[in-house]
Amino acid sequence: MNWITKFTVDFFCKLTKKQQIKNKTTTYEAKQENLATEVPVALVYNGISHTVMMCSPENLADFAMGFSLAEGIIDKPSDIYGIDVVPACQGIEVQIELATRCFVRLKAQRRTLAGRTGCGICGTEQLQQVHKNLPPLERTIQFDLNRLDACLIQLQQAQVLGQQTGSTHAAGFFDLAGNLLCLREDVGRHVALDKLLGWHAKQPAAKGFVLVTSRASYEMVQKTAACGIEMLIAISAATELAVNMAEQYQLTLVGFAREGRATIYTGKERLFF
């Protein structure tokens, strides 16, 4: 299914501005634009709605798996027995069949996260729930930072939704040779990462790192570490809390990934150049 919805600009009585120098006047022309679809997606565990988030409606099974792992709802992929994506009134339900042990724990957390766009603190009742006490990551990988420029090119070229709409974030998983293994896109940067982590959960032997097109927030660091991935690279900056958490989890965190440059915040032992 094509989840990109096309609207003619004339329908909305708007014009796409196009500058042309002609007799010192500005001309305008009607143009058709691609808009990224954004819909409410409810994650329903064992028949009970847990959260509603605004998402791009694709790769939703990956989203459910990645969100469940990163939020600590499940301990391993096999704790989910089944995932069904079902159209609902004005949105989509992702119905997740969860192991009883995990469902009992989920109900005890008493989280109400309706209306989120991917921010993990919204709806959390206790501040202790924000800062997860994760074990330090082992150091099992090394990456040649000289390969980063090629990774950035691959990431940009693979962003189909981003190229067509200009309004989505992307998260990519690269192996240690710098090859793009998977890319996920979404209107929300955290959701794009959740979708990627859901894919990664099905590839237990995959060694590599995550590259995202956004800043590195504390929650993105936490999600990455919770899924056992040792390195997160962001195109924009990291926040102070993200750096502090990366140090605690012994995760390699890199920001300002641009052509010919990068800022290493933590975990330089996994990098060489």
Swiss-Prot record:
One GO location term (cellular component): cytoplasm
Positions of Mo-bis(molybdopterin guanine dinucleotide) binding? 256-261
Q: Which InterPro entries match?
A: Cytidine_deaminase-like (IPR016193), FdhD (IPR003786)
Q: Which UniProt keywords apply?
A: Cytoplasm, Molybdenum cofactor biosynthesis
> Where found, per UniProt?
Cytoplasm
Q: Please give one Gene Ontology molecular function term for this protein.
A: sulfur carrier activity
Q: Which Pfam families match?
A: FdhD-NarQ
Entry annotation: catalytic residues:
119 (cysteine persulfide intermediate)
Q: Name one GO biological process term.
A: Mo-molybdopterin cofactor biosynthetic process
Q: Which NCBIfam families match?
A: fdhD_narQ (TIGR00129)
Assigned protein family? Belongs to the FdhD family.
* Purpose of the protein: Required for formate dehydrogenase (FDH) activity. Acts as a sulfur carrier protein that transfers sulfur from IscS to the molybdenum cofactor prior to its insertion into FDH.
What name does this protein carry?
Sulfur carrier protein FdhD
Query: To which species is this protein native?
Result: Pasteurella multocida (strain Pm70)
The gene name reads fdhD
